[in-house]
Every structure is written in C-alpha cells, then in structure tokens.
C-alpha cells in the first residue's frame, strides 16, 4: 500500500476499504518497531509493504536453516542438501519481527494477522497506515496498544 492510491483515486478513495497486515502496536513481534526504525533511517521512509516483517522473518529462517545444514568441502565449495534444508526449516523456532515463527508440517511458518483499513480523506500528505487509512477491524483493545 502506498500514498499513490490516494493520488490516483482522488476523492473516490474516501471510504475505500482494503485488507492489509495488522501493523498496529501489539500485533507484530517485539522487534518490529526496531525494524521499522532502522529501515526508515536507511531508506528515508517507512516500509510501504505490510509484508516486510514476514519477508524479513522468512530471510532469517532461511539463513538459520542454511547455517545449520551447509557443508563445505576441502576445496571450499559449499553444499546444501535439499532434504536437510527442508528438515531444518521445520525444526527452527524463533521470535521474529512478525511474531513467533515456527513451521508446521505443511510449511506454514507464521500466523498472518489481517486487518481492514479504511481511507478517511483524499489528501495524499495524510497517508500513514493506521491514520489514513485507519484500521477499522479488528478493534484495537487497550491490551494491544
């Protein structure tokens, strides 16, 4: 999701609802605010995709699995067995930036937390996930703030 949707749709964007990952406080893992801060410092803007936390965790999971099973021979060539890699992925558990990461036997490794957001005005300068568009579902509770 990006501010371009507001510019492209103009006034028609007001009231438009979209599903997107829940990035409100408490919905992601404890490391999420640090990821957003470091990303913003590096690139000059916050991530525009709600899937950045899951992508980051997927990369961490892959690196942990590779570190666990990679074998290097005498010539310096590194080998990664497919079955060993798959088996390693299924055993790794960690607290990711998107929340707890642990793969089930079908390869689902994270619990996706969707939310519904609604655009409240047509001014592109007001774009900020959680503000415009604002989260309308699930309701934010005091314990998740």
Sequence positions of predicted segments:
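Extracytosolic ligand-binding ectodomains
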Residues: 1-145
């Amino acid at each position: 999701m990006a501010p371009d949707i507001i510019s492209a749709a103009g006034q028609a964007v007001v009231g438009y609802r979209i599903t997107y990952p829940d990035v409100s406080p408490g919905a992601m893992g404890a490391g999420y605010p640090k990821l957003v801060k470091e990303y913003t410092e590096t690139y000059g803007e916050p991530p525009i995709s709600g899937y950045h936390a899951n992508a980051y965790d997927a990369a961490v999971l892959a690196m942990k699995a590779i570190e666990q099973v990679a074998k290097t021979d005498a010539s310096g060539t590194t080998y990664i067995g497919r079955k060993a890699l798959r088996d390693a992925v299924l055993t790794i558990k960690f607290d990711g930036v998107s929340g707890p990461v642990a793969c089930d036997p079908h390869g689902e490794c994270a619990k996706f937390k969707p939310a519904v957001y609604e655009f409240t005005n047509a001014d592109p300068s007001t774009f900020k996930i959680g503000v415009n568009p604002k989260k309308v579902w699930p309701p934010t509770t005091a314990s998740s703030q």
